[in-house]
Amino acid sequence: MPRVESETYKRLQNDPSCIRNICIVAHVDHGKTSLSDSLLASNGIISQRLAGKIRFLDARPDEQLRGITMESSAISLYFRVLRKQEGSDEPLVSEHLVNLIDSPGHIDFSSEVSAASRLCDGAVVLVDVVEGVCSQTVTVLRQCWTEKLKPILVLNKIDRLITELQLTPQEAYIHLSKVIEQVNSVIGSFFANERQLDDLFWREQLEKNENAEYIEKDDSGIYFNPTDNNVIFASAIDGWGFNIGQLAKFYEQKLGAKRENLQKVLWGDFYMDPKTKKIINNKGLKGRSLKPLFTSLILENIWKIYQNIITSRDSEMVEKIAKTLNIKLLARDLRSKDDKQLLRTIMGQWLPVSTAVLLTVIEKLPSPLESQTDRLNTILVSESDTAAMDPRLLKAMKTCDKEGPVSAYVSKMLSIPREELPVESKRIASSDELMERSRKAREEALNAAKHAGMVENMAMMDLNDNSKNTSDLYKRAKDTVMTPEVGEQTKPKPSRNNDVFCVVSEPSSALDLEFEYEGEDDSDSQDNFGLDFVPTDIDPNDPLSSMFEYEEEDPLLESIKQISEDVNDEVDDIFDEKEECLVAFARIYSGTLRVGQEISVLGPKYDPKCPEEHIETAIITHLYLFMGKELVPLDVCPSGNIVGIRGLAGKVLKSGTLIEKGVQGVNLAGVNFHFTPIVRVAVEPANPVEMSKLVRGLKLLDQADPCVHTYVENTGEHILCTAGELHLERCLKDLTERFAGIEITHSEPAIPYRETFLSASDMNPPQNSQLGRGVHELLLSQYKITFRTFPLSGKVTDFLSQHQNSIKNILKTSTSSMDPVIESTGSSFLDKKSLLVAFEEVINQEEKSRELLSGFKVKLAGFGPSRVGCNILLSQDNLLGSLFEGTPAAFEYSDSIKNGFQLAVSEGPLANEPVQGMCVLVESVHKMSQDEIESIEDPRYQQHIVDLSGRLITSTRDAIHEAFLDWSPRIMWAIYSCDIQTSVDVLGKVYAVILQRHGKIISEEMKEGTPFFQIEAHVPVVEAFGLSEDIRKRTSGAAQPQLVFSGFECIDLDPFWVPTTEEELEELGDTADRENIARKHMNAIRRRKGLFIEEKVVENAEKQRTLKKN
């Protein structure tokens, strides 16, 4: 098929009923990009022979090298369907535009799936039939369920059942049935959870005496069933695929049955009676051993083709098969020794996978007209947003009205090298424009000279013996132009195109000055002016042009060098050798976007109740249609389409909402990214002078990757947070080669830890036996404050961790200082009443928690760290006030104690890491009498303190730390959940690698119908670097781990433990030969942070050196 003209795409964009926005999602290596290649080949974008090999949408070199997708790529496909009309020989032609997004499958890049899913209306879910449902398969199915995307299922790599597992057609049919059951069971679990939440919500409404009717949801249409034509059986690498409807049409004439009837019986327990030639079910078998129709009519024919081509080549049988299927084979095809190519030729003509997928997409997945009505409640963040938005905008979004107000959602910002953008036609400037440019160039030259203090001297200087009266020329030039103040000229001018970010790979020459003017048509055609050459835009007939001709030794050279050094940063910002442009990846929900249109940009924190905050204005400079790596320029783009937008750089960081100016908008940026940036490194330039380029590069990387988090530590270090080892490697490569363009050095990956304590049997005696364990009395000025600490149970800690977003929403806490690990976790929002009810239920599950946290609603004074963490601050007798009840604090310095609590849980006593699972109770605040003060013997006590409130903050922190250490302290390390699928041959090697890295096996089971074992293990993140490569080496590539961050886990060892009993001393000695893992990690963290470490520098001084005796 020849390539489709861009005008065809533009025409189809105007009809949302013929548009399908879909994304391809799956586990890593399940065949997404190979399937995309086949779909691209159907549009003539690539050759059919290269489909599955070229990986067209993997445009990055490292994607091609590793063979995995790292970034989402979009492309538009054209598909035409011919349907028969009753009473007419002319077929009914319907054209469709399919906007396809190929997303990554690796867990490190799952944020790309989240960004793609919000833009789409449907999803193509691929499952490798040999590996079955894997960890990422469940993740992408959950993403589809959350975003209300309608999915279709593609059972890919069926050829592996023939060539690798060597199953019979009947065994393959049973295996395929089980895979479909696995997928449906996952979807069923989502439905059951949602139904349970609906039931809980209904009961809460009844308790409020609201007449709420319970609506029972039907689950009949949510499952995959081949008879419903929402399942495709395929082998993308071999280029074939089909759904039941296609083969029902194929066998319609051969069997003399109606297509609708055949479609109902081609899948399932239906058989053909060989005597009566009738289709029967299980009841009609009567003990006979018959094969299902799917096996006898479909799978056996496919198996026969593979056996006669791949297993043992039989040319006569191949010709017979081609004739039966009405397939045209050339003589060169039959003579070819490439069996795979012959197989692709036959199967591609009989059952092309592109036709099967695109036909199913058109028939089963909704258009924007249909989906936006159903998904609008999911897209909108809350009901209050809906009530506050303009009714015209709401109606336009529901109907996908291209004439209504504009609304669009930007899911992420793409960074594209400027040279890869489409070249725009440049208009030839008129003579008047050339003269104006020449005048401006002279004006800039005079300003630069004036700044150098050389204007007066130049009138007296003869630059060239052969030139004419240069001093007169300079005087005339000075008189004919307006020279603004030098201070205004040295300020960097903002670019008209907000989307151009410059990256300097080498320092600019001191003479290569360049200026930009408002009168230019495009930023590419900037006028360059250098004092050592004639600018190209100066009219050669201008009598003043000779003043720009200089000899090789320029008398102004030294002065201009001084100017360049003074304004080096400004120069770097204005001119560079490499440029990156930010293009927004967006979906238009209503209205029509036009180039040059002024639009309102709403940030993710925008609230319709405060319409003046988190809102900016931008101008759309360019619109693009995505065609893989290529971009097609557009002038307008109506609703229902996926489009690229330039002009939003600096306005949209990672995601945002575009609303027509003057219209009350709504926040569409409520997408929940299921990722956690857990791996952190400190980056710095190899050359300290290039720090500004690193900062600029980090900002651009932060915008271009939705999973990256960058910030500056208190120490001044620039920190880069990524999702995993592979993601970190890609980010550092992009930062070096694209965004910063400089050589970068980075620290060893730093993993976040947590600190906690527990009650253990071998704890040391309490510090104060009279007060009890975990109690500390703070004596400060005239106050005696008693603090009590105790550990929270695991269920309470998990609840607080899962509902941090709800707590933050209720307390309206700013997220600017939140830990990125905290920000990315959390479930859906709960209101205040629901949160307290759910929290009380969790507390009542355990007797100890119920005893310690009784009456928490009145006592609760705060959470921490960042006021939303997994630690609780309580107070007796309203000393600190009540957080939820709103009662005032009885103690005048309550804020100081609250701030001290936040400091204490933000940096624990072990290694200055955040504390988790601690409850602090302020039992009493006693104002001491003079006699009590005089009886105090503590030498650290101070009675007269000038700034008591400030001193109380640090003293509270120290007191809580003292009470913390009275228990058995523990270091918590970050844990990966590791899923590995491997064969029995290398099972022992996988176990060895995991155990060697302090991991533990959680479960192991053999996947039914396959020779593979499914292993689930927990591996510490700090020990997981190089794990994937190590396992691949040990197993010769037979096993590939998938690592997902799953929280923090205690190292079950006291970091301060030393041998004390006779048995321990006898076994381990005074120096404890057994390594204390907890102490090792605690010391490593303290060493990295520059904290004191209690360790012996020299153990045995006499053994350091052996002197020879003469």
Curated annotation (Swiss-Prot):
Q: How is its activity regulated?
A: GTPase activity is stimulated in the presence of 60S subunits.
Q: What Pfam families is this protein classified in?
A: EFG_C (PF00679), EFG_III (PF14492), EFL1 (PF25118), GTP_EFTU (PF00009), GTP_EFTU_D2 (PF03144)
Give the GO cellular component terms, alphabetically.
cytoplasm; cytosol; ribonucleoprotein complex
GO molecular-function terms, A-Z: GTP binding; GTPase activity; ribosome binding
The subcellular location is: Cytoplasm
Output the InterPro entries linked to this UniProt entry: EFG_II, EFG_III/V, EFG_V-like, EFL1, EFTu-like_2, P-loop_NTPase, Ribosomal_Su5_D2-typ_SF, Ribsml_uS5_D2-typ_fold_subgr
Protein name per Swiss-Prot or TrEMBL: Ribosome assembly protein 1
In which organism is this protein found?
Saccharomyces cerevisiae (strain ATCC 204508 / S288c) (Baker's yeast)
